[in-house]
A protein has these predicted regions:
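An anionic, turn-rich surface loop/hairpin at beta-sheet edges
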Residues: 52-53, 80-101
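N-terminal secretory signal peptides
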Residues: 30-62
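Stable alpha-helical elements in mature extracytoplasmic
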Residues: 27-31, 78-82, 118-125
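C-terminal motif of bacterial Sec signal peptides marking the signal peptidase cleavage site
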Residues: 17-18
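Sec/Tat-exported extracytoplasmic proteins
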Residues: 35-42, 77, 90, 126-130
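A short acidic-to-branched-hydrophobic micro-motif
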Residues: 63-81
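A short, solvent-exposed beta-edge/loop patch
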Residues: 91-130
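Bacterial N-terminal signal peptides that target proteins for export
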Residues: 1-7
């Protein structure tokens, strides 16, 4: 019985690591390149301070006259990994106590998608961002 449990837990661990998204090596600015490759017109890309959301890096990508915040959390650092896990559970970030919905994919949090006219296309690109 113990042998079966060990095999089951080993297979479960193998499956979980195989399904995880590993995009920690990418930069927030790289997301703009992925959008362009998918035929989405990127109007501008600029660095923004990552401090408000305690991220390690951040950029604002303008698509369809609307900016998307792309925040990277370095998952090799324990504090960043815990913060990202908290955001995954909450599915929102707060600015002055006001909650805003976010999308999480791998090491990245995407902010400001809800009102973007190209939201569906951008979401498809997010799923390829690794």
């Amino acid at each position: 019985m113990r042998h079966r449990m060990w095999i089951f837990s080993a297979l479960l661990t193998l499956f979980a690591t195989g399904c995880a998204v590993n995009n920690n090596y990418l930069r927030p600015e790289d997301f703009a390149d992925y959008l362009r490759r998918d035929g989405i017109r990127v109007e501008s890309v600029r660095k923004v301070p990552p401090d408000p959301f305690r991220a390690s890096d951040a950029a604002a990508v303008k698509v369809a006259d609307s900016e998307i915040g792309v925040y990277k959390y370095d998952t090799t650092a324990g504090a960043q990994r815990r913060r990202l896990k908290w955001i995954e559970n909450e599915k929102r970030l707060y600015i002055n106590g006001i909650p805003y919905p976010v999308r999480i994919y791998g090491s990245f949090v995407f902010f400001g998608l809800e009102r973007n006219p190209a939201k569906r296309k951008i979401l498809r690109t997010i799923e390829k961002f690794n």
